[in-house]
From Swiss-Prot:
Keywords: Phosphoprotein, Ribonucleoprotein, Ribosomal protein. Ribosomal protein S6 is the major substrate of protein kinases in eukaryote ribosomes. The modification Phosphoserine is found at S237, S247. Residues 220-233 have a biased composition (Basic and acidic residues). This is Small ribosomal subunit protein eS6z. Gene3D superfamilies: 1.20.5.2650. It comes from Arabidopsis thaliana. Component of the 40S small ribosomal subunit. Plays an important role in controlling cell growth and proliferation through the selective translation of particular classes of mRNA. It comes from the Eukaryota. Residues 239-250 have a biased composition (Low complexity). The gene is RPS6A. GO terms for cellular component: cytosolic ribosome; cytosolic small ribosomal subunit; nucleolus; plasma membrane; plasmodesma. GO terms for biological process: translation. SMART domains: Ribosomal_S6e (SM01405). InterPro entries: Ribosomal_eS6, Ribosomal_eS6-like.
């Protein structure tokens, strides 16, 4: 069985291959998120504590948290759930997919582990070297949270602490820092005020246009009523004059 061991404190990751079943027995029948002592793997892992994060079987089916079985099951999954990508599906469509339970069994080919507690000896490639994080946070609120800043502090000066320096394709030394998103500046506030003013202007124009339309509609209806009353009055006068004429007898 292969072990993908990750060390979050150093940012390193390493793949180990262990074929001895006696060493692997400590991991059997354990579930995802359980912690396992690394003493059974050998002297070099003495004192280490690993946390199981997942794995895959020999056919490539991933383990799913919450499925309490060591074997494989077919579940009805929708888009957004683990073990189902769901690209190109219709909205709300569900598919029945094969997944493996969250209990570790000998059928697994890869098991993902995370070092929770460091042991006595250093593991080459995991604990002896440190890989710095290449990219820091980009959003202004997360930068404030990282450096414990207040609302009135300027975030832009703190981004330079994790500015990357590297050589581009032309062989020139350049530096790069993330573009801060959701940064509140006087220009953004001015744009916001302009948007609100434009919106208010549009609402006022719509209200005035609606009022003018109602006035025009009322005047047109009044003209229509006046014309109708005039035509009715003419009709009545014609009928009354025709009734008042004496009938001509032969």
């Amino acid at each position: 069985m292969k072990f993908n061991v990750a060390n979050p404190t150093t940012g390193c990751q390493k793949k180990l291959e262990i074929d001895d079943d006696q060493k692997l027995r400590a991991f059997y029948d354990k579930r995802i998120s359980q912690e396992v002592s690394g003493d059974a793997l050998g002297e070099e892992f003495k004192g280490y504590v690993f946390k199981i994060k997942g794995g895959c079987d020999k056919q490539g089916f991933p383990m799913k948290q919450g499925v309490l079985t060591p074997g494989r099951v077919r579940l009805l999954l929708h888009r957004g759930t683990p073990c189902f990508r769901g690209h190109g599906r219709r909205t709300g469509e569900r598919r029945r997919k094969s997944v493996r339970g969250c209990i570790v069994s000998p059928d697994l080919s890869v098991l993902n582990l995370v070092i929770v507690k460091k042991g006595e000896n250093d593991l080459p490639g995991l604990t002896d070297t440190e890989k710095p994080r290449m990219r820091g946070p980009k959003r202004a609120s997360k930068i404030r949270k990282l450096f414990n800043l207040k609302k009135e502090d300027d975030v832009r000066t703190y981004v330079n602490t994790y500015r990357r320096k590297f050589t581009n394709k032309k062989g020139k030394e350049v530096s790069k820092a993330p573009k801060i998103q959701r940064l509140v500046t006087p220009l953004t506030l001015q744009r916001k005020r302009a948007r609100i003013a434009d919106k208010k202007k549009k609402i006022a124009k719509a209200n005035s246009d609606a009022a003018d339309y109602q006035k025009l509609l009322a005047s047109r209806l009044k003209e229509q009523r006046d014309r109708r009353s005039e035509s009715l009055a003419k009709k009545r006068s014609r009928l009354s004059s025709a009734a008042a004429k004496p009938s001509v007898t032969a």
